[in-house]
């Protein structure tokens, strides 16, 4: 069963200022917790476009949302196709869009998906099971230089070079096939003293490989920039991130669109062309409550940022 506890469920949706007849987009359907909370606030004229690249999540969501199916359009696609998705549905602008980034609990907890460093499984990590690139190809076929780059950039792993060297040495003998094989190789690349600090020694490398396999940061950047153009004036975008790379990227994008073009000096009135595209609703990210943490330990690293469209 695809069971998933949504993080900051109320805040994410409530900050969208839901209109009961509005049109909204859930870019990361997952376990459908946020979707259900939102749909309970929509009347029969309201509509939710629910996007996920994981077919298992969509099939599960149809059961979770069975009382609201007449208000939902399910889309199996990557959220970086947001504009195309809305164009195909003949929707010009929507009232709000939200993202719950990162891997959902069911994807982590089902060993066969290969996301977890706690369970043995084939190296996979594909959110979209129909794509060809998996963790196996990244680990066994990407160059030493490419591995160092993703471990450092996406995992902020200070022992990136040592770990990549160990992977390179192992795969020359035989392919690294499973998650726990990879964990053992990662541990070889980290000094014993460092392994005892900062959580599981494989956490950062697994995160880096997952981001690379699913092209997560690039896809999010593409999608949220499209979202800014797809939301009506007064509408909002909510984003929950789970690690510093995502949060930094979200903050930078919102800041960039909040700044607006440089205004020429001496203008008595600022023309609309020089007004910013959006304003940040919260300057500092909202973090999980104690209730969230009690229900889901993964909420500890969650941050919520919200922006309102101005033009």
Curated annotation (Swiss-Prot):
Record-linked Gene3D superfamilies: Putative methyltransferase TM0872, insert domain, Vaccinia Virus protein VP39
Q: Where in the cell is it found?
A: Cytoplasm
As for family, the record states: Belongs to the methyltransferase superfamily. RsmH family.
Q: What is this protein called?
A: Ribosomal RNA small subunit methyltransferase H
Which reaction is catalysed here? Answer: cytidine(1402) in 16S rRNA + S-adenosyl-L-methionine = N(4)-methylcytidine(1402) in 16S rRNA + S-adenosyl-L-homocysteine + H(+)
Give the UniProt keywords, A-Z.
Cytoplasm, Methyltransferase, rRNA processing, S-adenosyl-L-methionine, Transferase
What InterPro entries does this protein's entry cite? RsmH, SAM-dep_MeTrfase_MraW_recog, SAM-dependent_MTases_sf
Concerning SUPFAM superfamilies, the annotation shows: Putative methyltransferase TM0872, insert domain, S-adenosyl-L-methionine-dependent methyltransferases
Give the protein's biological function: Specifically methylates the N4 position of cytidine in position 1402 (C1402) of 16S rRNA.
Q: Where does S-adenosyl-L-methionine bind?
A: 32-34, 52, 79, 100, 107
> Biological process (GO) annotations?
rRNA base methylation
Q: Which residues cross the membrane?
A: none
- The organism is Staphylococcus epidermidis (strain ATCC 12228 / FDA PCI 1200)
Keyword hit for Methyltransferase: yes
Give EC number(s), comma-separated. Answer: 2.1.1.199
Q: Name one GO molecular function term.
A: rRNA (cytosine-N4-)-methyltransferase activity
Cellular-component GO terms for this entry: cytoplasm
